[in-house]
Amino acid sequence: IVLMLIGVVVVYKILSVVYKENWDKNLSSDVSFSNKTATKGDKIDIIETVVNAKKLPVFCMNVKFDIDRSFIFGQNDTNSMVSDKTYRNDVFSLLSNQKVTRRIAVECSRRGVFRLSAVEMVFPGAFMNEIMIHRSRLYSDITVFPKPADVKSLTDVNNMIMGELERRKYLSEDKFVFAGIRDYQSYDSVRDINWKAYARTGNLMVNHYNETVSRNVCLLLNLESEAAYMQEDVVEYAISIAAGLSQLLIARGVNVSLISNGRDIDTKQNTRIEAGSGLSHFNQINTKLARIDISQDMEEFAQLMTSLNEECTMMAYAGSSRSDMIYVIISANKNDRIRKAAGSIMNNQNNKIWIVPRVNSGIGSMYYENV
């Protein structure tokens, strides 16, 4: 019996030392996002990969990491604890020379840039009576785009913008350069209907002429709250309106630019996107909107518009097409300084468009403010 006890002690000591010295050798873990980009409301996977590239098995090990609490795990999840962040703790058991990969489904519940920075492997020892930790860095991130506001809610503002573009087109298009015919739209003038085409096809068609100015719309996005405290739901809905309106206008072939006092999460600079069109430009706008960090101090919006107006005045003297820009303001804050600056920058517009976002009981809506 004594010899058996001595043998047990010797085996215990040997295994304890062997595992203590070698448990994390050729043992690695990685946690990453399945996508580089997503849109708010999308479901993605968090991928956990653990590799044991040695003969010594690791029968029980915990892999721990933290992630922003906006990522929602499934209702049946029991391996996460939510406080300031979501803390994840998963148990792995690996044989010799084994790789284990798990995919955990999560929902992206808010816009932003999110990063995984570190992972811990925690080993309780060969006999579950010790705690050994191996930390390593992670380099995975995801950009979650804002969910565009519903197209139906943007119908009125779209008609106002297209009406302003048509008004300017008639002031600038060359009636001697016929470009073709197209389907009639609600904002088209009766004088441009091609009656011969209507008689032939039975569908209303309008003449289309070459224009001497571009179709440019600039969205001015103010993220200053009107109240003393940050109305985060209203600010986020304003960003969604900017995304939805950009998507709608770009789909109609309009060049869209965007200027905001919302600052980039890394550069800390105001958000500014020059005019462009197409899917790649919409993705650029989405990326810029996703990168806005509303916790940072913001430039006063009235001052931003005043500086922009001075810049546009100088460009107009230089003959730049920027002088033909149509401005659309998205701002819940309606103080007198903003009103004055808005009146100046939209002085040449027949339709002065100011969208005021609001949120009631979690549901976003908007109305239009007079300038």
Regions found by a protein language model. Name each.
Residues 1-6:
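Hydrophobic alpha-helical transmembrane segments
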Residues 155, 186, 190-371:
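Exposed, interaction-prone extracellular/peripheral surfaces
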Residues 10-269:
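An amphipathic, basic-hydrophobic helix/alpha-beta surface used to engage anionic
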